[in-house]
A protein has these predicted regions:
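Structural motif
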Residues: 28-31, 94, 147, 173
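Hydrophobic, regular-secondary-structure patches
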Residues: 1-51
Length: 192
């Protein structure tokens, strides 16, 4: 039950995302609102390069939605500004382990060298090959989203009320909200 998001063609930040997040957080049905900067990038190690999906998050919020620490098989789920978490497939593919450095470059031309602090298993081969996770600030600068976010990940208390909440959020903020079914809770993403 992992979330695999379609790659965004062009990244634009949600307008006034801080105030949108505050409005969503104020809804009694809402449990967690986690800002994210997600996009496509290339990871380079020696002469090997792979296409990846970058998920930039604030761990103290995002880990309440997706319990990454439980999915770590090597290392820890630490994400500071210089860290990256990668999946088991990508790690095997590139021959990297915890402590190794990876160069990540994006379509916008930005590049960053990050240390692998943790290797995770999302229970899905494709996700383990493509998904990488880093600090929100690292992803923002890499993806050319300075100070912006491409998504707000939201969980609600009541699984069955999620569609309704998504609809309310769209009406309230003008931000489109999509529902995702995830394991036993409803999880959705608001995108601009």
């Amino acid at each position: 039950g992992s979330i695999v998001q379609p790659p965004l063609q062009r990244l634009k930040s949600i307008d006034q995302w801080q105030s949108v997040a505050t409005q969503i957080r104020a809804l009694p049905e809402v449990n967690v609102v986690s800002p994210a900067a997600n996009g496509s990038a290339l990871v380079v190690r020696g002469n090997a390069s792979r296409a990846i999906t970058v998920v930039g998050v604030e761990p103290e919020l995002y880990f309440r939605i997706v319990p990454m620490p439980e999915k770590i098989v090597h290392g820890t789920a630490r994400i500071t500004i210089n860290d990256i978490l990668i999946g088991t497939e990508l790690a095997n593919d590139l021959g990297v382990s915890v402590g190794d450095k990876l160069r990540v470059t994006s379509a916008s031309g930005s590049a960053n060298t990050l240390s692998v602090t943790g290797i995770f298993d999302l229970g899905n081969k494709a996700a383990n090959a493509r998904t990488t996770m880093m600090a929100l600030r690292s992803a923002q600068s890499l993806l050319g989203l300075q100070g912006g976010v491409s998504a707000l990940d939201v969980t609600v208390h009541d699984v069955y009320g999620a569609e309704l909440v998504a609809h309310r959020i769209t009406k309230l903020t003008g931000v489109e909200a999509d529902s995702w079914i995830k394991t036993n809770e409803q999880f959705f993403t608001a995108i601009s």
